[in-house]
């Protein structure tokens, strides 16, 4: 039986406990989850791609079933090149659904070889986003419980706090 691979794409700027929750739950369904960090020049990122990859790898530790990679261009092309058949997307609220639905339908119109699997975020993370974490952190607000300690430390360094 072939191994089932899924791709979990995003900017992960920075990775949060919400992202980690989706990755861990994805690993219960798939043999391998590829965390694919988007090289998106249109987004104004706090962490560069290499920093985001390093944080994700450190957070995931030595889990051999979770891979970290980058991609640019069409997501479905990347998914096919990886030999994966599923894109995992996390949904926090109804407001996420319409945008994610449109992306899934567009991907489906490009290729029917790739499915999109929506995973509802766990309740404690239903409001959580990287943008909220960055904003609260930039104002020296508490982000404990939102990101792992090493991510908090990296955010403190970005905002010149030690």
UniProtKB/Swiss-Prot annotation:
Keyword Endoplasmic reticulum: no
SUPFAM superfamilies, alphabetized: Nucleotidylyl transferase
Superkingdom of origin: Bacteria
Xref: Pfam families: CTP_transf_like (PF01467)
Binding site for ATP: 11-12, 19, 90-92, 100, 125-131
Binding sites annotated in the UniProt record for substrate: 11, 43, 75, 89
Protein name (Swiss-Prot/TrEMBL): Phosphopantetheine adenylyltransferase
Organism: Geotalea uraniireducens (strain Rf4) (Geobacter uraniireducens)
């Amino acid at each position: 039986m072939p191994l089932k691979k899924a791709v979990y794409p995003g900017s992960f700027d920075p990775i949060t406990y919400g992202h980690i929750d989706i990755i861990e739950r994805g690993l219960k369904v798939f043999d391998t989850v590829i965390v694919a960090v988007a090289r998106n020049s249109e987004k104004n990122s706090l962490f560069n791609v290499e920093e985001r990859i390093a944080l994700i790898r450190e957070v995931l530790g030595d889990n051999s079933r979770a891979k970290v990679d980058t991609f640019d261009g069409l997501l479905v092309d990347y998914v096919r090149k990886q030999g994966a058949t599923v894109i995992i997307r996390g949904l926090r609220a109804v407001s996420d659904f319409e945008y994610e639905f449109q992306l899934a339908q567009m991907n489906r119109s490009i290729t029917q070889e790739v499915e999109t699997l929506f995973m509802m975020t766990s309740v404690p993370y239903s409001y959580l986003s990287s943008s909220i974490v960055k904003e609260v952190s930039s104002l020296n607000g508490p982000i404990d419980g939102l990101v792992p300690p090493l991510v908090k430390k990296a955010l403190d360094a970005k905002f010149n706090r030690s």
